[in-house]
Amino acid sequence: PANGFSWADGKGDAVQGNNNESTSEAANAYGAMVLYGLAVGKSEIVDKGMYMHASTTAAFWQYWNNIDGYKNLGADYNNFPAGYTKLTTSIVWASGADFATWFSPAYAHILGIQGLPSNPLILYVGQYADYMKDYVELGMTETLTGKPSELKANEWMDLWWNLWAMTDADAALADYNSVGRNYGAEAGESKAHTYHWLHTFKALGHFKTGTGELTANDPAAVAFDKGDVRTYVVYNFSGQTKTVTYSDGKTVSAAPYGFTIQQ
């Protein structure tokens, strides 16, 4: 697609044209192509999935979040129309955008829908930690304390802990611990996964790859920064040791069929 993203509803039967709501759902589909291609050794599937995932995530930052406008790069880089005051949008149409969802007016849903299903295929959502801080603050507008623990039932408390962990894992984990296991998990999430996600980000810090500042020559390689400590994480789908090189000069010798983690 010309704009870098797919249409969730492409029939063209609405006055506003086609639309797309949850970019993360599309990113999961295209990221799954990458993982499948790596697992079965089909590079053409990997390449196609990488293109579609990268295009979708770039479109997410430009059209849903106006990241260049957020960074104040100038009027020529601003993708939101004059007078639009929200940090983000949720539904992009062929003719515009809505700060809404199809099913709910709650801010927790309007912003949270860009972060599900929650797994490593949506790590791009947290690649700008400063933006994510403001994103979480807006998403929690309708709570008393600005924390996910105050969300109503079915407002995705666990997904919001996961999103918050991308910018402040300590705060997210503290709020999670104030609730314990006494909450209802989002339909596509599990309590075990939320626990793992929060503790992983507490240990690793902020997602560092994704913006182009730090890259790797393998699609299953990422990195995280916590203070002065950088952690490199590689998953090797093959049966042979693989050497992965990062753009900062770090090389990782990844063991077969599993994770290799180095600092």
Please provide the spans of the model-predicted regions.
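Ser/Thr/Asn(+Pro)-rich, low-complexity disordered segments
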Residues: 1-11, 34-40, 51-263
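Active-site-adjacent structural elements in folded domains
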Residues: 8-20
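Aromatic- and histidine-enriched alpha-helix N-cap/loop-to-helix transition segments
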Residues: 21-28
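Surface-exposed patches in mature extracellular/periplasmic domains of secreted proteins
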Residues: 43-49
